[in-house]
Amino acid sequence: FDRAERGIELGYDADGRERGIALKNAVDDDAIFDVTAAISAVAAAGPVTVVGFCWGGSLAWRAATCLTGLAGAVSYYGGELPSKAGLISHCPVLAHFGERDKGIPMDGVNAFIKAQADADPAVEAHIYDADHGFNCDARGQYDAAAADLAWQRTLAFLERVRGTFS
């Protein structure tokens, strides 16, 4: 959200969510330019991966399908992924979804997984018995078991696509 409002920090209450949606809508498509700038800023240090949560998870998917030069992308509960099913990624992608996430219906997630399996085998997706935001311990939806498993899968994925991750 920094493109719209520098240094913004939002809570997970109704006001924070409402403000976050407004900021996302103000920035939306232009956010990929910020991702591109961030990638360029660190590219000389070695292979670059992007990891995003919620809208950031959608941006990670956009980066994987729109940009070249990434070693990999990880999306945690990216709400846009089902509507972008069938796109081909330019790098390996790991996607995490919560089965109880009311904002990302399972029929869309399952359609995304099937479309990607048919079109793009570089995409690996996992569904957890959890809600949206299951990885964030500051939220009521935090699910330690799902978060731990998703994080272990993320670290293994990062090692696979980048080499040793520390």
What kind of feature is each model-predicted range?
Residues 1-166:
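N-terminal cap/leader regions of alpha/beta-hydrolase-fold enzymes
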